Amino acid sequence: MGILYIVPTPVGNMEDMTMRAIRVLKEADMVLAEDTRTSSVLLKHFDIKNRLVAHHKFNEHGTSAGIVERLKAGETIALISDAGTPGISDPGFYLAREAAKAGITVQTLPGPTACIPAIVSSGLPCDRFCFEGFIPQKKGRQTYLESLKDEVRTMIFYESPYRVVKTLQQLSLIHISEPTRPEPIS
């Protein structure tokens, strides 16, 4: 059986790519990418010439079975996202789950992710925190935010820069955002 490698990619700085990640990408039989246009820039930068195949939220349910079959046949496949670690608010969870269910080794490399540097540099308590990922854009957004009202741990959200002000306003309306609870934005 092959191995599925989950390979983090730089979040804004190419120097954050590890030597191990470069080696895995060069040795893989195939590289799955959230956006092949974005990922081709990364691969070109590190002189990686492997086959690049789109694997994103719009096709992952349809392509995962075929990928699992390739892994069962012994191929080594690497999964990358546009930035950060695949599966963390990015495509990858479904494929990793299906591969693990099939008994395939899923190996995640350590590396870049946006949330950890953000919380560590925020000055907020980071000994215990909850990661909420992207807030729903429309359906259930207010209910979702209200469900977090009693959460006392530091919370991490991913949000579009175009919705940050709106989100902060919504958080203040349901008292998640108070003067005693700072809101660093990273």
Residue ranges and their predicted role:
Residues M1-F58:
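Glycine-rich, flexible N-terminal cofactor/catalytic loop recognition
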Residues V11-N13, D82-P86, P161-R163, R181:
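Short glycine-rich anion-binding loops that position phosphate/pyrophosphate groups of nucleotides
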Residues N59-I67:
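Glycine-rich, highly charged phosphate/nucleotide-binding loops
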Residues I67-T113:
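Glycine/small-residue-rich loop that forms an oxyanion/phosphate-binding "nest" at active or ligand-binding sites
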Residues Y94-E151:
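Class I SAM-dependent methyltransferase SAM-binding "motif I" and its flanking Rossmann-like core
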Residues G140-L173, S177:
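ATP/pyrophosphate-binding catalytic subdomain of soluble kinases
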Residues I174-S186:
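Single conserved hydrophobic/aromatic residue that forms the stacking wall/gate
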